[in-house]
């Protein structure tokens, strides 16, 4: 019997979590909360507008920890990080809400969104319509659908629920087979290519470059994971990739927003700042 991969372990726990949550708060209660939530801010629209100008469309991630690296950021105040990212030029935010493997929380998404005007994606392992409605109830503007975690029927169902509640969808792929499934099943304009293999957690930027020719021009390619320096950014930009999801490089910096500006907008110069987020 093979040893379960990281992703398989996460998904097994996620099924338990959904059962526990739905026992506490019913789907109909969540649907009422979703209807009462602030209007969506237009996640896809913001990214498409920025990338169309051939400017970096950065989804800046708020992430305390990961299964592969452990705790990434000790000084973790989501509201302050969100403000810092907005000041640094982020187009959107990504907030981890997975508790067991990423030390995330629903409250982190709410705190980050209230602190800024940027659209926010709920970064989690979505496997059930309950989580999609829950995301909108929390105030999310977009949800992540990971192809390696879903079959085609479930993927289509979750995307349909997202549309019904007013959420954009970012579909995430890692290889050619997943890309083919995503393009066949979903019409979302946002296609994220994760350079990290979710089974082994190994990272290679070649993943994005290899899949790029197979992605239709009417979809926006978002390169995810492994962007650590200017050379990585320039490698993508010369290949006409202008949308990025970056977390760890920012989370390890003293001021995440200044690091964002240094990495993506060096022509603006780096502002003088104290040791705290401001």
Swiss-Prot record:
InterPro entries: Aldolase_TIM, Indole-3-glycerol_P_synth, Indole-3-glycerol_P_synth_dom, Indole-3-GlycerolPSynthase_CS, RibuloseP-bd_barrel. Pathway: Amino-acid biosynthesis; L-tryptophan biosynthesis; L-tryptophan from chorismate: step 4/5. It catalyses: 1-(2-carboxyphenylamino)-1-deoxy-D-ribulose 5-phosphate + H(+) = (1S,2R)-1-C-(indol-3-yl)glycerol 3-phosphate + CO2 + H2O. One of its GO terms (molecular function) is phosphoribosylanthranilate isomerase activity. Keywords: Amino-acid biosynthesis, Aromatic amino acid biosynthesis, Decarboxylase, Lyase, Tryptophan biosynthesis. It holds the Pfam family IGPS. Its EC number is 4.1.1.48. GO terms for biological process: L-tryptophan biosynthetic process. It is an enzyme of class 4 (lyase). Belongs to the TrpC family. PANTHER family: INDOLE-3-GLYCEROL-PHOSPHATE SYNTHASE, TRYPTOPHAN BIOSYNTHESIS PROTEIN. This is Indole-3-glycerol phosphate synthase.
């Amino acid at each position: 019997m093979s040893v379960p991969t990281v992703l398989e372990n996460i998904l097994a726990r996620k099924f338990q979590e959904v059962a526990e949550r739905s026992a506490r708060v019913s789907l109909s209660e969540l649907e009422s909360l979703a209807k009462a939530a602030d209007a969506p801010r237009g996640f896809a629209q913001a990214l498409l507008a920025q990338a169309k100008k051939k400017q970096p469309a950065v989804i800046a991630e708020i992430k305390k920890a990961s299964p592969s690296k452990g705790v990434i950021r000790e000084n973790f105040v989501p509201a302050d990080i969100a403000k810092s990212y907005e000041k640094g030029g982020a187009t959107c935010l990504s907030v981890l809400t997975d508790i067991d493997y990423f030390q995330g929380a629903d409250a982190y998404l709410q705190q980050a969104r209230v602190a800024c005007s940027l659209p926010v994606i709920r970064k989690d392992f979505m496997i059930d319509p309950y989580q999609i409605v829950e995301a909108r109830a929390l105030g999310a503007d977009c949800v992540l659908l990971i192809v390696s975690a879903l079959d085609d029927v479930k993927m289509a169902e979750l995307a349909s629920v997202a549309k019904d509640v007013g959420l954009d969808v970012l579909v995430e792929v890692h290889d050619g087979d997943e890309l083919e499934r995503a393009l066949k099943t979903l019409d979302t304009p946002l296609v994220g290519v994760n350079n990290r293999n979710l089974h082994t957690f190994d990272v290679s930027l070649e993943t994005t470059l290899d899949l790029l020719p197979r992605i239709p021009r009417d979809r926006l390619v978002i390169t995810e994971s492994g962007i650590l320096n200017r050379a990585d950014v320039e490698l993508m930009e010369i290949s006409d990739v202008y949308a990025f999801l970056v977390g760890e490089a920012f989370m390890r910096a003293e001021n995440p927003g200044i690091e964002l500006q240094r990495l993506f907008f060096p022509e603006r110069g780096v502002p003088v700042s104290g040791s705290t987020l401001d």
